[in-house]
Amino acid sequence: MESTHNVLGTIQESLAQASRRAAAADRPYVTLSYAQSIDGSIACRPGRPLALSCREAMVFTHTLRSIHDGILVGIGTILADNPLLTVRHVSGKSPRPIVVDGRIRFPADAQALQHHRKMPWIATAEEPDTERERALVKAGVKVLHIPFDRDGLIDLTLLLMQLRELKIRSLMVEGGAQIITSFLKHRLVDQLVLTMAPVYIGGMQAVWPLQLNPFNPPRLENMSWEMCGSDLVMRADITWREP
């Protein structure tokens, strides 16, 4: 693993290369980015938010947001953390907030709706034109109707294809655990940006069982890392092998 003090520069170059190939791509370039403890925990338990990143790592993360077209989270993150999903701490444009919400549980008072210059897009498998959908559309939300996959979750492959049609060329995926796991399970991640806080939590893991071939797992390549305050930030390309 290469030690470097320009992880952000490497990420920007990866996005630039993806942008040059964007015309032929059928989905956005996906950056999976999240913070965890040294033992892989992202929360003490489900539904309970946990602040892990130091200020320097937060600045890094918000800079990362500013260079992506979209930012995606699951409805569990909205309900547990009520995040803004904006760029703060640094100058730059905020990405389009995209929420995977199979049954439209998105609350009308969510900060991502009330305090974001760009209205969120919600991907759901709910029947169209429900009362809840009409209320969100009236508030400015764009609803994307995506069917469930065979696991009973939003079909992420179809979602990404639709996002690409909507001019989302780069997508930052932040979580939570079910979203992280689903993107990895379906081989939809291009690069990983992992922030590790120097603490043990012993809580909910970021990645659940992937049901991949243990003898031919995906590999991290072109790895680089740097310290952001007290946190370690690691960046790598993900190489997917045959199942």
Please give the residue ranges for each predicted region.
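Enzymes that bind and transform nitrogen-containing heteroaromatic metabolites
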Residues: 1-243
